[in-house]
Amino acid sequence: MKRAFIMVLDSFGIGATEDAERFGDVGADTLGHIAEACAKGEADNGRKGPLNLPNLTRLGLAKAHEGSTGFIPAGMDGNAEVIGAYAWAHEMSSGKDTPSGHWEIAGVPVLFEWGYFSDHENSFPQELLDKLVERANLPGYLGNCHSSGTVILDQLGEEHMKTGKPIFYTSADSVFQIACHEETFGLDKLYELCEIAREELTNGGYNIGRVIARPFIGDKAGNFQRTGNRHDLAVEPPAPTVLQKLVDEKHGQVVSVGKIADIYANCGITKKVKATGLDALFDATIKEMKEAGDNTIVFTNFVDFDSSWGHRRDVAGYAAGLELFDRRLPELMSLLRDDDILILTADHGCDPTWTGTDHTREHIPVLVYGPKVKPGSLGHRETFADIGQTLAKYFGTSDMEYGKAMF
């Protein structure tokens, strides 16, 4: 029986890539800088002491970081017995965004350039804004700028509630984000607006990767909170992913837990399970692993590392999240049968000690565990697509165009 379980710790980079200079990210190191802050006692808010990740370390995390950067992260045990196979992987795709990273993991790197809204103020073309106002019958709009999602709620949330004008904003990623209050604006109305925005961006040739619905609740600045009803409208991958091939060629099953289905625009997904927060995502993943049959992938994205702690530059929160993940990891490992493989990885970096609020161009960890997986180093991988090619070989689908099987 062939089953693979892929866990993406969204934004969990392990050191800057060789091309980081192109992105202004030389020296970025999500894991290394979190570990350093913890070792110095600078991340004791809600947790305490050196970064404690014994289970990830046994799967090769510290060694993968050493391969990427040349050193073991502060406070982590470089001499621990390694029971998994580990690697550090470079991104072949042109960007450092979520779709690019995920698609490349599934064997389809993004070799074209996404469109971006690069102006920090008045970010969106007037023609696009006018069409959105007209088609969605809006009283206007707010924002039209680059911003952190939580900052812009404090700045414009109250005005949005009074006027009914949606908040439009973007970032260094190829995204068009729309924040609206779940109660005063309405969730269905927000989703409809996002569908219109997706259509206009696609038809207008803007080449924008995602439209993201960012619903929130609360009644005044300071207590607005984003909810778990986020929805991403992505374009489809430019070629069949290994997920699609498993479904088409092997009549397999691909279970999305969290936002995976959104990222792949539902392509190659046979079941969607919604969950919000690390514990809920873990619980849902465990349930699906227990029920998984032959030729099945269970694919989970743990988004909080990126959205709650990476972008918000919350070192202590990120560290606490990693430690929670590590504590629960044995629950996943204990469910593996003879031929199963568990892959822990990431899609990009988001160093919470870095300047700004955006992603960082970093190597990702590739930690592979299973009863028949030979422990040890799988070395430096030139593309995340090596994961997809490995899965193609494992399930016996046709080869992917990019990547080399790791074993």
Swiss-Prot record:
UniProt-annotated binding residues for Mn(2+) 2: D306, H311, H359
Descriptive protein name: Phosphopentomutase
List of residues binding Mn(2+) 1: D10, D347, H348
Keyword Endoplasmic reticulum part of the UniProt annotation: no
Modified-residue entries (N6-acetyllysine), positions: K287
Top-rank lineage group of the source organism: Bacteria
Function: Isomerase that catalyzes the conversion of deoxy-ribose 1-phosphate (dRib-1-P) and ribose 1-phosphate (Rib-1-P) to deoxy-ribose 5-phosphate (dRib-5-P) and ribose 5-phosphate (Rib-5-P), respectively.
Gene source species: Escherichia coli (strain K12)
Recorded metabolic or biological pathway in which this protein acts: Carbohydrate degradation; 2-deoxy-D-ribose 1-phosphate degradation; D-glyceraldehyde 3-phosphate and acetaldehyde from 2-deoxy-alpha-D-ribose 1-phosphate: step 1/2
Similarity comment: Belongs to the phosphopentomutase family.
EC number: 5.4.2.7
Cofactor: binding details: Binds 2 manganese ions. Mn(2+) and Co(2+) are equally good activators. Can also use Ni(2+), with lower efficiency.
Any single Gene Ontology cellular-component annotation: cytosol
Top-level class of the enzyme under EC nomenclature: isomerase
A single MF term (Gene Ontology): magnesium ion binding
The encoding gene: deoB
pH profile: Optimum pH is 8.
Cofactor(s) in the UniProt record: Mn(2+); Co(2+)
Subcellular location: Cytoplasm
PANTHER family: PHOSPHOPENTOMUTASE (PTHR21110:SF0)
UniProt keywords, alphabetically: Acetylation, Cytoplasm, Isomerase, Manganese, Metal-binding
Activity control mechanisms: Inhibited by a number of metal ions, including Cu(2+), Cd(2+), Zn(2+), Fe(3+), Ca(2+) or Fe(2+). Is also inhibited approximately 85% by 50 mM sulfate and 95% by 50 mM phosphate.
Alphabetical list of InterPro entries matching this protein: Alkaline_phosphatase_core_sf, DeoB, Metalloenzyme, Phosphopentomutase_DeoB_cap_sf
GO biological process, one term: 5-phosphoribose 1-diphosphate biosynthetic process
Keyword Membrane: no
Record-linked HAMAP family: Phosphopentomut (MF_00740)
